[in-house]
Amino acid sequence: MLLALNTCGSTASIALGVADKDDVKILATAELAVRTYSARLIPEIAALLESRQATLRDVEAIVVVNGPGSFTGIRVGLSTAKGLAEGAGIPLIAVSRLALLAAASLLPHVLAAVDAGRSEYYVGEYLNGENLGEVLLSGEETVAVATQPGAGVLVCDESRADDVSPATSACSALAICGPVYVQPPDAAVALAFAMKRFRAGQFDDPETLNANYLRRSDAEVLRLARPAAK
């Protein structure tokens, strides 16, 4: 059995699943309101396990979405996942919220964008699942990056897309023009996304795993925004 937590967005989600051949079978899920994260997360995990007549001893791995997103939500989710992993000796897998968003689009080249507030966006560039860079950008910088020649499809989740909508007028190189809205990935999506690493035994060290907050940085962190080599 596997346990997944996602506390990065406006709601938190928990999922239980089991490996099923090449996929994962979701057994149970639960959602929490943002204001109840710190008080309700562990009790909800216990209740979800109890609903399947299971305990932490039955959990083979814990998957946690470690950001970017709500600083408070990330801290609560990550500290809970790390505490359970260390306390019960359970392997831990951390996944990026932007990577989940890119994967959910089912497109090969993606700019995944999540509203960071104050007209800023968390933006990640992914090519065939490979992380080419993640950065915190202003709305204007996001538009500039999204309209570069060869830019991937701009994908937004529950975010406000007002600041990035101008990209729709300059995406002639894209197979699909403009923002593609994807259902915000929940813990069940994170669980399925992490199955490849679970089967390969690729786990994170709880002692060294950090939150993926994403600070202000140069837009050239993204591959497509870097000057071409001469």
Predicted regions and their residues:
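A short alpha-helix-loop-beta-strand transition element characteristic
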Residues: 202-206
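A general structural signal for well-ordered alpha-helical segments in protein cores
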Residues: 38, 42, 81, 187-191
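Surface "functional belts" at beta-alpha junctions
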Residues: 20-27, 31, 36-37, 91-186, ...
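DPxDG-like acidic metal-binding loop motif
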Residues: 61-92
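Stable alpha-helical structural segments in soluble proteins, enriched in small hydrophobic residues
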Residues: 48-52, 87, 105, 187-198
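N-terminal beta-alpha supersecondary unit
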Residues: 1-66, 184
